[in-house]
């Protein structure tokens, strides 16, 4: 619609534009990579990629996003015995639940900082222009998050500059879900034999899914949680646009 209006009111376009439409984002875009490889020679000469979403922020303003965090998702699992054990042995037998919870707790502190060696050392720090842009235009803040999502727990970072730097330019480790033990009605006094967790880390430039996966495995081994099985499930690298580029 915008292009039709431009051509109608102004005339010929001053640039060449190629449209690419993909409708499977919510199901992980499983065929997108094949498509890009097939048409790489047609797409690579482009000077600029614009991923149009049409999102508006809470002020009703259209936004330009100069990058996206990447992601690695992975499963953690552990088996502590052949069968669930009566909880009377809880003083002398380790359960899969505690073992997994302790392993996860070793990976992040209570302020959200990742404790895995090699993560922060690799990230590409924001430059002065990037920090100035988010301080000037970003509207995310601790109070708005409390209001929008009805937060019940303390927010991890309330100072505005630190909040924005962490939110935009630092990785984040999250638990997507945990499955362990009895979840039915009433009580079942057991030490669960199996525990699983679905995890993710949001990535920033400098971190690749492959590198982070090896850091996670090395961390668990170093901390004494070598019985944890780590299963990679998804990985995508981040990107950050050069906001000083003439095209932008």
Q: Residue ranges of each PLM-predicted region?
A:
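Internal, well-ordered domain-core segments that constitute the primary functional module
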Residues: 45, 65-80
């Amino acid at each position: 619609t915008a292009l039709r209006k431009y051509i109608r009111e102004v005339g010929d376009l001053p640039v060449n534009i190629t449209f690419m439409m993909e409708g499977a984002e919510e199901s992980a875009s499983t065929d997108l990579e094949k498509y890009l490889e097939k048409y790489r020679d047609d797409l690579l000469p482009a000077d600029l990629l614009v991923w149009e979403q049409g999102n508006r922020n809470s002020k009703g303003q259209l936004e330009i996003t100069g990058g996206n965090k990447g992601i690695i998702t992975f499963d953690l699992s552990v088996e502590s015995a052949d069968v669930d054990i009566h909880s009377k042995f809880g003083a002398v037998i380790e359960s899969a639940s505690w073992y997994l919870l302790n392993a996860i707790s070793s990976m992040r502190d209570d302020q959200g900082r990742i404790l895995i060696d090699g993560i922060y050392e690799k990230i590409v720090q924001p430059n002065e222009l990037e920090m100035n842009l988010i301080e000037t235009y970003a509207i995310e803040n601790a109070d708005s998050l409390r209001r929008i999502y009805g937060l019940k727990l303390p927010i991890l970072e309330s100072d505005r500059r630190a909040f924005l730097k962490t939110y935009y330019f630092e990785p984040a480790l999250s638990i997507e879900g945990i499955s362990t033990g009895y979840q039915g009605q009433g009580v079942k006094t057991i030490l669960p034999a199996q525990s699983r967790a679905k995890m993710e880390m949001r990535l920033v430039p400098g971190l690749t899914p492959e590198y982070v996966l090896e850091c996670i495995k090395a961390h668990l081994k170093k901390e004494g949680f070598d019985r944890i099985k780590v299963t990679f499930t998804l990985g995508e690298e981040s990107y950050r646009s050069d906001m000083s580029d003439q095209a932008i």
